[in-house]
């Protein structure tokens, strides 16, 4: 079988034309050079968002916190001053009340000393003098708002009486005060003490 002659390789046989230097690519001076990212420029003479300094919202928040702290400190100072002023006024009122009460009993002491002075000359007069002083002291307590309770024949009242004895008495209904061993003074919230009494019981 006849052999077909091979054709020469055109790519190998064709001469390669040299490419001029710099052809097909931009000059080096036209290549983009890497650099820092561009920042937004200021407009109308105002600093950009990356300018130094806190944001306006942060400034407002800080200012609001400072105002609240100042108000809180002023409120604490006002409360402390109010507490001290109230304590001073309360102590002053107590001192006035103590002075008023003590002054009310000065005449009682004067009459008691007068009765003791005359006791030597007339021993029988001492009883009347002591009774008069007692009545005067009772009147002073009543004027101060503490009336005396020493009644018998009245019904037992737990708000005024304290039972210290129980007896049988056919002439009095049960629960009747038949004897007062110690008078009471005052009523309700202003009670100094209840009266110590003896009451009747059922048979």
Curated annotation (Swiss-Prot):
GO process annotations (BP): protein folding
Domain of life: Bacteria
GO MF terms held by the record: adenyl-nucleotide exchange factor activity; protein homodimerization activity; protein-folding chaperone binding; unfolded protein binding
Amino acid composition bias (Low complexity), ranges on this chain: 45-56
Keywords noted in UniProt: Chaperone, Cytoplasm, Stress response
Coiled-coil ranges (or none): none
Protein localization: Cytoplasm
Positions of the UniProt region annotated as Disordered: 1-64
Compositionally skewed regions (Basic and acidic residues) per UniProt: 1-12
GO cellular component: cytoplasm
InterPro entries in the record: GrpE, GrpE_coiled_coil, GrpE_head
Record carries keyword Chaperone: yes
First-listed, main subcellular location of the protein, grouped into a coarse class: cytoplasm
CDD domains assigned to the protein according to its UniProt record, in alphabetical order: GrpE
Self-association and partners: Homodimer.
PANTHER family: GRPE PROTEIN, GRPE PROTEIN HOMOLOG, MITOCHONDRIAL
Function: Participates actively in the response to hyperosmotic and heat shock by preventing the aggregation of stress-denatured proteins, in association with DnaK and GrpE. It is the nucleotide exchange factor for DnaK and may function as a thermosensor. Unfolded proteins bind initially to DnaJ; upon interaction with the DnaJ-bound protein, DnaK hydrolyzes its bound ATP, resulting in the formation of a stable complex. GrpE releases ADP from DnaK; ATP binding to DnaK triggers the release of the substrate protein, thus completing the reaction cycle.
Family the UniProt entry places it in: Belongs to the GrpE family.
UniProt name for this protein: Protein GrpE 2
Organism from which the protein derives: Streptomyces avermitilis (strain ATCC 31267 / DSM 46492 / JCM 5070 / NBRC 14893 / NCIMB 12804 / NRRL 8165 / MA-4680)
Origin organism lineage: Bacteria, Bacillati, Actinomycetota, Actinomycetes, Kitasatosporales
């Amino acid at each position: 079988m006849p052999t077909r002659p091979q054709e020469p390789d055109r790519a190998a046989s064709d001469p390669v034309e040299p490419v001029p230097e710099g052809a097909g690519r931009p000059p080096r001076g036209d290549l983009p050079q890497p650099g820092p990212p561009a920042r937004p420029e200021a407009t109308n003479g105002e600093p950009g968002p990356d300018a130094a300094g806190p944001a306006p919202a942060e400034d407002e928040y800080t200012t609001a916190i400072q105002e609240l702290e100042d108000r809180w400190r002023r409120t604490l100072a006002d409360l402390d001053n109010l507490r001290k002023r109230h304590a001073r006024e309360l102590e002053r009122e107590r001192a006035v009340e103590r002075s008023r009460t003590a002054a009310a009993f000065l005449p009682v002491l004067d009459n008691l000393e007068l009765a003791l002075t005359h006791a030597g000359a007339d021993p029988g007069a001492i009883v009347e003098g002591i009774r008069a002083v007692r009545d005067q002291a009772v009147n002073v307590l009543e004027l101060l708002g503490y009336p005396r309770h020493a009644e018998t024949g009245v019904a037992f009242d737990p708000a005024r009486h304290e039972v210290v004895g129980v007896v049988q008495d056919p002439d009095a209904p049960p629960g009747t005060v038949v004897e007062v061993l110690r008078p009471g003074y005052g009523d309700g919230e202003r009670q100094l003490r209840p009266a110590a009494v003896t009451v009747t019981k059922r048979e």
